[in-house]
Amino acid sequence: MELQSGVSEVADSPAALEKAYPNLRHLRLLEAAQRCGALTTAAEGVHISQPAASQAMIRLSNQFGGKLLERHGNGVFATDRGMIVISRTRRILDLVRSFSQGVSRRLRSDRPKRGGSLESHLTVSHLKAMCFVGRAGSFSSAARALGQSEPSVQRAAREIEGIIGLQLFSGGLRRVQLTQSGLDFSKLASLVLKELDSAYEEVREFDGAYDGRLIIGTLPLARTRIVPDAVVALSQKYPEATIGVLDGTYEGLLQSLETGNIDVLVGALRGKIMHSGLKQKRLFEDRLVIVSGKGHPLAGRHELTREDLANSRWVLPRRGTPTRHLFETLVGDGNLKGVIETGSLVALRGILTQSNFLTIISQRQIYYELQAGLLEVLPFSLEGSERPIGLTTRADWQPTALQADFLSALETAIMPV
């Protein structure tokens, strides 16, 4: 197993750099052939000659490691391997068609300016260019990331802008700003590339090789024990898999989730998620406790009062986080002076063990510190501090077997404190 960790800003998957992705028109041909049962009819529908269609199927079969179509009688039928690829292709077509419908509404017409559908003009070069321009913020940085010349990246990006018929960029060559339409297409490009990655990974799984990728976004509560325990269990089952564990702000991780840069986000759930393309699943309820370093003056008390807490110094998460909001509701911080704000467990541990500061935190986050006797829980019940912990995914996410097994490992890793 290869384990990667970092922050959400470095979540760019190298898959788009490493793979020779299939031709999107060839995938449309495969999907149409399975749907109508005839390669000739499918070729006419995607405007490919019969000889070219036959060559396209040979090339696709080579790319995906085996036959995708078989001829029986007068028709063609998809193999099991072929259906894996077709399933992902249909998800790609749904994404592209949904985007095209949005474009049509903005243009108040039923087709993009150049008179053809985005579906028929879209290429992998367009996807890569827009995906990486969106991430890097400039044509030059995107070109370096892709290992291409800057003019070729610019050409692909400007070409898709013309096909769509909406302005995708503002600003100059050195630093480009994506318009809302540009952001939307960059997200589409990233998700389509993700589906292509998943098609390859599922075919590999079909062949018994579980060497795919799983990228996990983590919020504070999940980073210490829940996700690590699940990752260890998963790596024992799939030693060839690459697993990335990323942290970052909630907003940054949500954006990475929406664009397919991470597969699942684990941590405290928000009451109402503002992103329509995402969904939450509750796994368990967690409670907060008041914690100090070993030997704190309040640690030997059998009972604490709110006055004791009000007269103490605190290390707290930044304002706007769920834990800080609960602290303000349950304890109040109107008169607190000299508060230290940090989201770093390492910094928090160092401060508490060397001072008389207090903090409010989940016991699950400091499991190892409690076991080592570095910190201790103070006798003050925070009634009403329960909060749901779970996972957030894209609403239409179709996980690979590796990714689905992580969800099972995650539920197993949820042990009582």
Regions found by a protein language model. Name each.
Residues 2, 121, 206, 251-288, ...:
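Short beta-strand-centered segments that line the small-molecule binding cleft or hinge
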Residues 33-47, 133-145:
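Short helix-boundary/capping micro-motifs
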